[in-house]
UniProtKB/Swiss-Prot annotation:
It comes from the Bacteria. Its EC number is 2.7.7.6. It catalyses: RNA(n) + a ribonucleoside 5'-triphosphate = RNA(n+1) + diphosphate. The N-terminal domain is essential for RNAP assembly and basal transcription, whereas the C-terminal domain is involved in interaction with transcriptional regulators and with upstream promoter elements. GO terms for cellular component: cytoplasm; DNA-directed RNA polymerase complex. GO terms for biological process: DNA-templated transcription. This is DNA-directed RNA polymerase subunit alpha.
């Protein structure tokens, strides 16, 4: 059925071709023309950089004080062992970090399958070689810390925060948390009914075996959708800064003239002239007050001194006086 010309086609997951246990091809179609590259590039970048996973972050090897040393009876030097440990594909359920141990003796390869761990830890590449012991008397013991994270975090990024409490012999490892090792995409032609200008997106993905390809696509799409949510509703959701409202008038101007504690004679003269608030008083001039019946120079001097003690004076101009709160009274 022919849809509206403005209606976008919605892609669907067409096929998951499992090339191997760690290699899959995921096909999505149909896509509007150009959307294959738009979505393919976005998903590719997220799958490479933003997938959560687990990685080795710290190692303690018995008898080893620093990474620039060797261990008797072990073919590889310590730096090479640390590099091999970065290749461990570990999956941890329900925890953010775990400690796993490795104890091996006797000539031969030491592999990931020799590691001892709890039931909530799964090693996806048990055949991965960590090192080689060169004689029957050789042995190696290590404690390996595995943490959950995202992306790539070099050991140098953690040195400054951990060096004060990190004991000698605890070796830091560059952490590659992403379970996706390689990813590429291709855009091919697709057809729906009479339309032949559509895209088909084929994502070619290799993982370390700890994440299912279909789940990886689902997680990447969820991350992308969450990041785009802000563009769906472009209203400014920032919390506005609360501006402190400054009072229109100095609070002292709103106080009654009785608070000035004038003499009874002076106070009565002011009330007779309907001067009830200090704000009313400071707007009067000396000439105006001297015209007030029974208010002489002595009372005027008293009023001026009391106002001056409060940083006020006669003859002040107050815009918008009286305020609404006083006017209503």
């Amino acid at each position: 059925m022919q849809g509206s010309v403005t209606e976008f086609l919605k892609p669907r997951l067409v096929d998951i071709e499992q090339v191997s246990l760690t290699h899959a091809k995921v096909t999505l179609e149909p896509l509007e023309r150009g959307f294959g590259h738009t979505l393919g590039n976005a998903l590719r970048r997220i799958l490479l950089s933003s997938m959560p996973g687990c990685a080795v972050t710290e190692v303690e090897i018995e008898g080893v004080l620093h990474e620039y040393s060797t261990k008797e009876g072990v073919q590889e030097d310590i730096l090479e062992i640390l590099l091999n440990l970065k290749g461990l594909a570990v999956k941890v359920e329900g925890k953010d970090e775990v400690i796993i141990t490795l104890n091996k003796s006797g000539a031969g390869p030491v592999v990931a399958g020799d590691i001892t761990h709890d039931g909530d830890v799964e090693i996806a590449n048990p055949e991965h070689v960590i090192c080689h012991l060169t004689d029957d008397n050789a042995e190696i013991s290590m404690r390996i810390k595995v943490e959950r994270g995202r992306g790539y975090v070099p050991s140098t990024a953690r040195i400054h925060t951990e060096e004060d409490e990190r004991p000698i012999g605890r070796l830091l490892v560059d952490a590659t948390y992403s379970p996706v090792d390689k990813i590429s995409y291709a855009v091919e032609a697709a057809r729906v009914e009479q339309r032949t200008d559509l895209d088909k997106l084929v994502i070619d993905m290799e993982t370390n075996g700890t994440l299912d390809p279909e789940e990886a696509i689902r997680r990447a799409a969820t991350i992308l959708a969450e990041q785009l949510d802000a563009f769906v509703d472009l209203r400014d959701v920032r919390v506005p800064e609360e501006k402190e409202e400054k009072p229109e008038f100095d609070p002292i101007l709103l106080r009654p003239v009785d608070d000035l504690e004038l003499t009874v004679r002076s106070a009565n003269c002011l009330k007779a002239e309907a001067i009830h608030y200090i704000g009313d008083l400071v707007q009067r001039t000396e000439v105006e007050l001297l015209k007030t019946p029974n208010l002489g120079k002595k009372s005027l001097t008293e009023i001026k001194d009391v106002l001056a003690s409060r940083g006020l004076s006669l003859g002040m101009r107050l815009e918008n006086w009286p305020p609404a709160s006083i006017a209503e009274d």
